[in-house]
Amino acid sequence: YNIPVIILAQYLSAIFILAPEKRALDIVLDFNLFILVFASSLAIASGYIINNFYDSKKDLINRPNKSMLDRLVSQKTKLNVYFTLNFIVALMALFVSWRVFLFFSSYIFFIWFYSHKIKKYPIIGNLTATLLAVLPFFAILLYYYTRIPFEDIENYKRQLGVIFSHATFLYLLLLIREMIKDLENLKGDLANDYKTIPIVYGEEISKKIITTLTILTVFPVYVL
C-alpha cells in the first residue's frame, strides 16, 4: 500500500508546496511529472518483487496462505518481471532527465542490496527498509528544484522545511510498521537466521522502541 501513498504525497506536494503558483489541473496534466510519478510506482513495485524473491523461505513459515499463492508464480518469473520493471523505470527516468535517471538507478541498486544483504541485520535493516520506502517521494524534488538557479534556493527554504517535516513523519510511521512486522515474523526470522531487533534484543525492548517512536511522531507534527 506504499504505492498509492507515495503517488498521493508526490502530487499533493507538487500542488500545495512545490508549485502553488500553478493551477492544480496543470500539475496533474504535466506529462513529465506523470512519468516521474509512474516511474516511482514501478520502482517500488520492483522492490516488492525482489524482496518477495529473497523472502520466499521465510514466508512459508510467517505467511503460509500467501506462500501458497506465491508458489503459483515461479522464482524465474519473478526475476523476469523484476528486470523488466527496472528497465522500464530506467527508460522513463531518462526521458525526464539524467538526474532522475541516476536517482532511480541508485534506488534500484540499493533496494536490491537491502533485500539481498542488509535486511537480515538488526536496526540498520529497519532503518534502511524505511528509508527505501520513503525515498521515491524525493524524486519530485529533482523535478522542481533542479530548475531553480542556485542563488534562488534560499527563497525555497520554507517549502523544503515543510517537505522534510512531512517526510520525517512518514519515515517514523513506516519505521514503526517495520518494527511491528519484525514482531509478527519472529518464527520465520528465527528459522532463517535473520538478526532482527526482537531476536537479538528481545520482544520487550522492541515494544519499548515502538512506544518511543510513536511518541517521536509528535515532533514533526508540532513543527508543521
Task: Give the predicted meaning of each segment.
Residues 1-224:
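Multi-pass alpha-helical membrane architecture of UbiA-family
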